[in-house]
Amino acid sequence: MNAWLILICAGLLEVAWAVGLKYSHGFTRPVISVFTVVAIVGSMLLLGVSLKKLPLGTAYAVWVGIGIIGSSMLGMLLWQESVNFWRIISILAILSGIIGLKLTA
């Protein structure tokens, strides 16, 4: 499987575990807590697999960037976190950085 696709899946699992952390209420909800731990482990495993082919700095930055963008977007959509011009510009800057890293890797 393509290392970039694996890395994207790892990033999406990072978003899943971040949301799981929010819903687990400090790991006091067992089912959601198990989901969260599985997502954490899966995210780390996939990141590790992607590192067989991708440079560490690039892969880590993309992985974190996907997590930041995904969790920020879900925070705005699900929990009414602030939506303002500078927040959107910052998210777009992260996205452009991810695209730049992909194009230069």
Region locations from a protein language model:
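Polytopic alpha-helical membrane proteins, predominantly small-molecule transporters/carriers
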Residues: 1-105
